[in-house]
Amino acid sequence: MSEEELGKLNEKMEAIIGLSKAPSQNIVFFSLLGTGKTMTVGEISSEVGLTSKATERAVAKLLEKELIQRAPFRARSYSCDSKEILLGLLVTVQNLKERLDKRGL
């Protein structure tokens, strides 16, 4: 994996950590990640109990952060790449372990 790819993964992991400060984005992200489904804004709204407008704003922000993607095969639908998120988490854990090892912890 290139340094650029690692950098992008680290940025995404930081963005995920930052979702705790954005409750609507947090709930939409984890709903898409947890279900593994491709969903429309209306479906996401029903799933998580947010208004359509709040869901639209959350989806727009998550797209901007590249934490979710537009589904290529279903109009106005979104999904979350769980494999990419898992890879990012593994890289983050590996980095954390290396830092702890350097400190002798």
Where are these regions (language model features)?
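Short helix-capping/hinge SLiMs at alpha-helix to coil transitions
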Residues: 32-36
